[in-house]
């Protein structure tokens, strides 16, 4: 598979209606850039741009993105989170201290950062997958920081874990908003049939959704069928066809 890059698209039309956006021909970030770092040499994944009006790192726009790479000392392959800075969202400069957040275990994913500021603390909601300390495959949790660079991992219970028939395989990829006093935690839910959808957890009971996955497709299961109803057979004289291989088989 070809590696993924980070691109840029824009629109001058209202966001409330579905329409095609204009896209830049070339990526704004690529693993082939001269300043690409070791932790992103394999491929780049999801990005999110945080508008830091205080310019904590010297620029108003901070892009958090996760990428795959091998550690130059341990050779561990993992997905880690790094940042890049911009003044116009068109040209980006990688932070020299990348990655800013990672879990060093082979095959582990630390990704899809979603940044919110609560008081004077920056909160990074993120998902982790294939973490050897967990029995489940993917889950949502968070880390906190005062400067967008140094992050302290939450050591308490994970926020969202696989626990329902719609997210029993993966419960990951956070997007968190607070509206009218209620915190809504949207996330991607994947069940054992690999059906994928958007689920939500709330800070207080808000009822149940009426949306459901389609009935699961049954695979690799032996089925017994009765063939004695509605079937007919004919006895054909194969000699009439000159050669038995030419005779039709009718059931």
What residue ranges belong to the model's regions?
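Extended carbohydrate-recognition surfaces in non-catalytic/accessory domains of CAZymes
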Residues: 213-251
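Intrinsic-disorder/low-complexity regions
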Residues: 11, 65, 87, 111, ...
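Conserved beta-propeller blade repeats
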Residues: 113-114, 174-175
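Beta-rich carbohydrate-recognition and catalytic domains
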Residues: 1-45, 50-108, 116-169, 178-213
